[in-house]
Amino acid sequence: MEQMAHPSSTPLLVAEIGNTTAMFAVFSGTDPIDSLQVATAALSSPEAVGELLQPLLARHSLAADAVISSVVPRAGEAAGRWLLDILPGRVLAVDSTLNLPFRISYDPPSALGADRLSLCARCCMLEEEAAVIALDIGTAITFDVLSADRSYLGGLIMPGLELMASALHERTAQLPRVEVSRPERLMGLSTADCIRSGVVWGCVLQVEGLVRKIRGWLRSEHGEGYARVVATGGRAPLIVSMMEMPPLLDPHAVSRGARYLFELNRITVS
């Protein structure tokens, strides 16, 4: 565990590779200045990665280093191999062996995904000294909890919106496949609307209920007086917009956290 690292002004390429989509962002300091989003399935080989990334890197020729936060091993390896060949600097992969800004307790530590490590690192950048509940609302929905003194206290994993909707279609005889979007009304007037409303509102209320439950657990079990909630992920804007008490929404939270981990580990990767 280490104190806040001062961000470098040198452009850094951050690869955030999720189960469905991948984001490649060029950071200057703590903020992205350019980005490219692609389907993770498109990262099938180093050559495929190169075809996608060359235009982005051509616009930012000063970017010499990269950090990769990937939950899809094959795609992460393809990106890493191409970046190692093309960049003159360092390529760091996020994992639990890095110098982290929080104390980790997970069995085994290597099973805590790069996305969750990066998101927790982002939460350690918050100035206020309070516990944090970190939400990543994507293909899966993860909750990770940090104490005010930045100890990892545990997490939860549940299916995301598309997984819920696809399970209804795939595991029943007649329910249709439905595109998940914000429902027009609470009570559906067609089968598709009923599924859409049930999945989306069910997810909103699950998230709100679990946040309340975790806050109570933090008070009773760990003596934490307040917990900040941070949300990210492809489906976070939809769910957060429907919550009664919306959390801090940071679409770039995982990338910001990965960038922070690169700064904390500059010496060890040089």
Curated annotation (Swiss-Prot):
It is an enzyme of class 2 (transferase). Pathway: Cofactor biosynthesis; coenzyme A biosynthesis; CoA from (R)-pantothenate: step 1/5. The active site is at residue 115. Catalyzes the phosphorylation of pantothenate (Pan), the first step in CoA biosynthesis. The keyword DNA repair does not apply. Its cofactor is NH4(+); K(+). Substrate binds at residues 106, 113-116, 191. Belongs to the type III pantothenate kinase family. The gene is coaX. ATP binds at residues 16-23, 139. This is Type III pantothenate kinase. InterPro entries: ATPase_NBD (IPR043129), Type_III_PanK (IPR004619). One of its GO terms (biological process) is coenzyme A biosynthetic process. A monovalent cation. Ammonium or potassium. It catalyses: (R)-pantothenate + ATP = (R)-4'-phosphopantothenate + ADP + H(+). Its EC number is 2.7.1.33. Homodimer. Its main location: cytoplasm. It is found in: Cytoplasm. Pfam families: Pan_kinase. GO terms for cellular component: cytoplasm. One of its GO terms (molecular function) is pantothenate kinase activity. It comes from Chlorobium luteolum (strain DSM 273 / BCRC 81028 / 2530) (Pelodictyon luteolum). Keywords: ATP-binding, Coenzyme A biosynthesis, Cytoplasm, Kinase, Metal-binding, Nucleotide-binding, Potassium, Transferase. K(+) binds at residue 136.
